[in-house]
């Protein structure tokens, strides 16, 4: 199989990115789709596109997708309270296990929302339980690479009219992230018009409507228990995963 990685930017600012794992005969077709995706992005036509094609020599790991659960909410305030509660329920277990003050969880989540609302990061921020940022380069964050879904899963998701290609991309990322040892993930889209975001934990992938306002930037935060950052980086960036 081959790994295809697309990155697009405009005036140095991130516009679009995507990852695929495909067989050799699909390289040309998927490459064309990725370039079209970059050129037609609602956030603007990029002035720089990078497409990297690389043969995968490692074993492909197959992971069962997180259960998809949609949470309906009509206001950003309510949606963020829902996301906060999902994150708190998961983080509390790790705070108690590590003897940390659970009253500090709200501060950690506040910091996470501040990060995603600031936007313009190519990758995700990583926060430990004390609120320390662990990315090697804070302005870039970490990108989850070498991922894809099976055609069967993609088709199954897209049969639901309420779900989109963004859901397919997100479920691949969320499933890999949780299986790499991340406690939970908070994400909003960098697409200005797409207001649905999500929280991912071992309990599932929770799509939350209206998690941000239209026209607002997006971002991604991973919550982690320990600081084995080099091991986590290696898994998130290099471990090939196909989600089914």
From Swiss-Prot:
This is 6-carboxyhexanoate--CoA ligase. It comes from the Archaea. InterPro entries: BioW. HAMAP family: BioW. One of its GO terms (biological process) is biotin biosynthetic process. Belongs to the BioW family. Its EC number is 6.2.1.14. It is an enzyme of class 6 (ligase). Its cofactor is Mg(2+). Catalyzes the transformation of pimelate into pimeloyl-CoA with concomitant hydrolysis of ATP to AMP. It catalyses: heptanedioate + ATP + CoA = 6-carboxyhexanoyl-CoA + AMP + diphosphate. Homodimer. Pfam families: BioW. One of its GO terms (molecular function) is magnesium ion binding. Pathway: Metabolic intermediate metabolism; pimeloyl-CoA biosynthesis; pimeloyl-CoA from pimelate: step 1/1. Keywords: ATP-binding, Biotin biosynthesis, Ligase, Magnesium, Nucleotide-binding. It comes from Methanococcus maripaludis (strain C6 / ATCC BAA-1332).
């Amino acid at each position: 199989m081959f790994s295809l990685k697309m990155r697009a930017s405009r005036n140095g600012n991130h516009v679009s990115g995507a990852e695929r794992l495909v067989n050799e005969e699909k390289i040309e077709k998927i490459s064309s789709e990725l370039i079209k995706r970059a050129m037609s992005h609602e956030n603007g036509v990029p002035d720089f596109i990078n497409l990297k094609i690389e043969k995968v020599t490692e074993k492909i790991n197959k992971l069962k997708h997180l259960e998809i659960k949609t949470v309906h909410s009509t206001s950003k305030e309510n949606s963020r309270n829902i996301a906060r509660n999902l994150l708190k329920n998961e983080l509390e277990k790790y705070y108690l296990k590590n003897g940390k003050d659970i009253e500090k969880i709200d501060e950690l989540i506040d910091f996470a929302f501040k990060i995603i609302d600031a936007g313009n990061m190519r990758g995700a921020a990583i926060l430990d339980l004390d609120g320390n940022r662990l990315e090697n380069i804070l302005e870039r964050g970490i990108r989850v690479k070498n991922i894809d879904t099976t055609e069967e899963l993609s088709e199954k998701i897209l049969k639901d009219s309420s779900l989109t290609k963004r859901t397919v991309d997100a479920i691949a990322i969320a499933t890999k992230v949780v299986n790499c040892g991340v406690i939970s993930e908070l994400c909003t889209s960098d697409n200005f018009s797409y207001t649905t975001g999500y929280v991912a934990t071992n309990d599932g992938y929770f799509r939350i409507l209206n998690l941000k306002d239209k026209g607002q930037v997006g971002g991604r935060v991973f919550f982690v228990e320990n600081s084995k950052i080099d091991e986590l980086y290696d898994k998130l960036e290099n471990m090939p995963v196909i989600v089914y």
